[in-house]
């Protein structure tokens, strides 16, 4: 009896070793990419840029459409540029826009959603950049490194602004005409 018990225990312990794997096709993964011949690459420090916008009083805005008194500068550095590939480069900015004003990016408050403020971007000539559109102006590629300068500025989009921390998520893409 002890032999049968020992044999049974041995069989149970060995069953995972001799078990055959069973494979069931459950789905597929489609991976897609793109091979591009870009004229420039984005420098590492510009790939995940954080711009500190500062602090503003709600009474600094005179109503919907009014801008904050301060423009905050920021730059995007491009490297490994080659005029042999492309002669000009532009930057397109994309992100969520508020229904009240599609010419600015949404500025969301912590836990409140729309804070009543939008974020406007401007090029180096202080021309407003319209979100989710192709660039209106392109810079010539003259050297292997170049820095494109921009400014950001808050704009009231509502009479009702909610004080608190606010943030905007904006993505950029290099565009070659």
UniProtKB/Swiss-Prot annotation:
Disulfide bonds join 40-81. It holds the Pfam family Fimbrial. One of its GO terms (cellular component) is pilus. It is found in: Fimbrium. Residues 1-19 form the signal peptide. One of its GO terms (biological process) is cell adhesion involved in single-species biofilm formation. It comes from the Bacteria. InterPro entries: Adhesion_dom_fimbrial (IPR000259), Adhesion_dom_fimbrial_sf (IPR036937), Adhesion_dom_sf (IPR008966), Bact_Fimbrial_Adh_Pro (IPR050263). Keywords: Disulfide bond, Fimbrium, Signal. The keyword GTP-binding does not apply. SUPFAM superfamilies: Bacterial adhesins (SSF49401). Belongs to the fimbrial protein family. This is Putative fimbrin-like protein FimI. The lineage of its organism: Bacteria, Pseudomonadati, Pseudomonadota, Gammaproteobacteria, Enterobacterales.
């Amino acid at each position: 009896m002890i032999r049968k018990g020992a044999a049974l225990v041995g069989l149970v312990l060995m069953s995972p070793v001799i078990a055959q794997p069973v494979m069931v096709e459950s789905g597929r993964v489609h991976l897609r990419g793109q091979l591009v011949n870009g004229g420039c690459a984005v420098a590492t420090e510009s790939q995940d840029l954080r711009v500190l916008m500062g602090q503003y009083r709600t009474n600094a805005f005179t109503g919907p459409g009014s801008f904050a008194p301060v423009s905050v500068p920021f730059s995007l550095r491009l490297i490994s540029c080659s005029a042999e590939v492309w002669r000009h480069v532009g930057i397109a900015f994309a992100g969520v826009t508020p229904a009240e004003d599609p010419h600015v990016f949404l500025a969301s408050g912590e836990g409140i959603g729309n804070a009543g403020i939008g974020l406007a971007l401007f090029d180096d000539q202080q021309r407003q950049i319209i979100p989710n559109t192709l660039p209106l102006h392109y810079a010539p590629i003259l050297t292997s490194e170049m820095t494109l300068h921009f400014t950001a500025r808050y704009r009231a989009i509502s009479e009702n602004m909610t004080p608190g921390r606010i943030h905007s998520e904006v993505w950029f893409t290099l565009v070659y005409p």
